[in-house]
Amino acid sequence: MNIERADFVDRVKIFVKAGDGGNGCVSFRREKYVPKGGPDGGDGGDGGFVFLRANPSVSTLIEFVNKRKFVAENGKHGMGKKMKGRNGKDLFIDVPVGTVVKDAVTGEIIADLNEPGKIVCVARGGKGGRGNAHFATSTKQAPLIAERGEKGESRWLELELKILADVGLVGYPNVGKSSLISRISNARPKIANYPFTTLIPNLGVVKYDDFSFVVADIPGLIEGASEGVGLGNVFLRHVERCYLIAHVIDVSGYEREDPVRDYFVIREEMKKYSPFLLEKPEIVVANKIDLIGKEELEKILKRLRDATNREVIPVSALTGEGIDLLVSKLASIVREMKVEKSERKEEKFVKPSPVWRRLPEKFHLEVVKEDEGYWVVEGENLRVWIERFDLNQRDARLMLLQVLEKNGLNNKLKEAGVKEGDVVRIGDFEFEYRE
């Protein structure tokens, strides 16, 4: 797979909003000898959830450049005859395999979608409110009260694509990585004899007998890459995904004078970006051996092996010398690591519960004077009640006031200096204070 630069987007921000729960219904049966027909208001439907799903057919985040807002469907309101409102449809957003999902505000990593079909919930829908059928008691047989649905979650997300490749080719620009990937795979990258020809990661599929694996040409690595020189910090994150690092070194001496120094410079940049990269299996690929004499080559190979303590495979991407050995070695290592990974237990996706806050029974109340004769009751847990119920419903007001009175509302009003005839507001509901 060859990705054109114009289509390659690997970092975006999007906004997701889950659906709100539908409101419960106030309704009564039309039935003879039953007080007011008996309550039969149905519950509201749950709001739709928002999920991100790793889809192998999606290769970049380009689709999110022009569309950044994603909203799931709200739940429908409850109806009479105890009919529950329909749940809102869940929204599935397809992203490339290898996408890391972060909370854009906190930076917290929410999920790593590194397997095809892997799903993560990024916003939970609100639970539907209960209808008045739930509020009937032996003493309150015709309740005029129902709950509002909970609001669905919303958040800004940062999506960061880290390319999924089995082998990452790293090294200085112009050491022959693009030529090498075109020699061993089906990739056809742009190749020229000057630095930074490759400005996006090129991916190629390598076939070896009945086994295939993906190789990525990681561009932009030079001294200072971890700090952004040569776009290196942009591309180093793609190395994190690879099972194996193939460190390509130019041993010809024509453009790079000291292959050993080159090796350690790139390793240092990888370390600065993430020490974890140095723990990955690595082989050294000594390229351009066709441009150097056999005796001189042996000296350089010995220096590299002694200095790096790595297996060094001499190749020529131009003539093909050593390519078969290189592919065989890469396939062997990748195959072994894939078998090890496949033996790990896979996570099973379980859809979480919708947003539902338990109604608090205890409050820390505060009475605030907003104007002469006008007061507002505030409280840490009061917001849940205000959002859950329509205080224009008489029974909802009475239920809330009973709970507030148990928490000392009357005493708080007197202590604050509220006088008879003053207006007190709780949420959107206002009442005149009477002693």
Swiss-Prot record:
InterPro entries: G_OBG, GTP-bd, GTP-bd_Obg/CgtA, GTP-bd_prot_GTP1/OBG_C_sf, GTP1-OBG_CS, GTP1_OBG_dom, GTP1_OBG_dom_sf, OBG_GTPase
GO biological process entries: ribosome biogenesis
Example of a GO MF term: GTPase activity
Cofactor: Mg(2+)
Residues binding Mg(2+): S178, T198
Function: An essential GTPase which binds GTP, GDP and possibly (p)ppGpp with moderate affinity, with high nucleotide exchange rates and a fairly low GTP hydrolysis rate. Plays a role in control of the cell cycle, stress response, ribosome biogenesis and in those bacteria that undergo differentiation, in morphogenesis control.
Subcellular location: Cytoplasm
Originating species: Thermotoga sp. (strain RQ2)
Enzyme Commission number: 3.6.5.-
Family label: Belongs to the TRAFAC class OBG-HflX-like GTPase superfamily. OBG GTPase family.
Pfam (any one): DUF1967
Protein's UniProt name: GTPase Obg
Major enzyme class: hydrolase
